[in-house]
């Protein structure tokens, strides 16, 4: 079963949930504000697909990022810092994160990639 990590009221997460339901994909939703752990992030970052890196998990265009103190923004200079930042401010994480067998398969909403992954 696919795990979808996100925030319920995020429009991108809602769009992803709608697409997955429409395409009969079973998912388990995990709210990153309540249930995201350092174990999740460490496991993901150790097994990322070649087209992803830890920095891509930080949404540097969002309001949460823009409102961060410069000292917090400096955390993105290391994987350990990225994990710390996401755990402190889960809303800074790019969403959704789709995980299969404890490995990230997709980050963000991309219908074309969803069709390839779940065809």
Features from the language model and the residues they span:
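Local sequence-structure signature of Cys/Sec-based thiol-disulfide redox active-site neighborhoods
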Residues: 1-23, 27-30
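Unusually extended, aromatic-enriched hydrophobic runs near protein termini
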Residues: 8-16, 54, 114-119
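Thiol/selenol-based redox catalytic cores and closely related redox-interacting motifs
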Residues: 34-117
């Amino acid at each position: 079963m696919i795990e979808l990590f996100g925030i319920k009221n995020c429009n991108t997460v809602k769009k992803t949930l709608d697409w997955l339901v429409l395409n009969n994909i079973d998912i388990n939703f995990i709210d990153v504000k309540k249930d995201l752990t350092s174990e999740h992030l460490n496991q993901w970052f150790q097994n990322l697909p070649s087209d992803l890196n830890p920095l891509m998990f930080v949404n540097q265009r969002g309001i949460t990022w823009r409102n961060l103190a410069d000292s917090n923004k400096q955390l993105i200079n290391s994987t350990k810092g990225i994990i710390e930042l996401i755990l402190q401010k889960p809303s800074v994480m790019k969403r959704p994160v789709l995980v299969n067998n404890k490995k990230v398969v997709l980050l963000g909403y991309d219908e074309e990639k969803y069709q390839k992954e779940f065809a």
